[in-house]
Amino acid sequence: EYVDLLLLHRPDALMEPEEVAEAFDTLKTQGKVRAFGVSNHNPMQIELLNQATKGAVEVNQIQFSVAHCPTIDAGLNVNIQNDAGCNRDGSVLEYCRLKNITVQAWSPFQYGMFEGIFIGSEKYPKLNEVLNRLAEKYNTTPNGIAVAWILRHPAGIQTIVGTMNEKRLSDVAKAADIVLTREEW
């Protein structure tokens, strides 16, 4: 019995990287964990862990969706004086690509930390119009298109979808076969 992937959820200001490394090493040596990752860590926090763990961090799970993508917004607004140009995550997406760390998107249908789901939300009429149009074109649901949007990014982002609804899970799984064009993205 083992865990495929064990994540450290959220950074800890009092974390001692050497202690984490020792725990990682023990769990891996005992065959209890196959791989390690983090959630919501910036590049320097990952560097601290990787220095102590000899590069054990294989995954960084971040909040990411078509309606919540500040890591992309910051890159598109370089040298522009607006809020979207503020780099709040240390270029985590680019960093993970450079270091071959898999990015996983949690809450792929959410538009903020606690605000809710953007699909069908009155706050996102234009986005929902596009999602519905593309869903019809690709014979799927808006959820499927939202996941296809994430999968289209060249970083190879994986989505974490929590659902008890088999139909939703089936629709989301079909997103792997949808390749949005640049214009659709």
Predicted regions and their residues:
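Acidic/hydrophobic-patterned starts of short beta strands in beta-sheet-rich repeat architectures
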Residues: 5-6, 37
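Beta/alpha (TIM)-barrel catalytic core signal, keyed to glycine-rich beta->alpha loops juxtaposed to Asp/Glu
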Residues: 11-185
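Phosphate/pyrophosphate-binding loops at sites that engage ATP/ADP/AMP, CoA/4′-phosphopantetheine
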Residues: 1
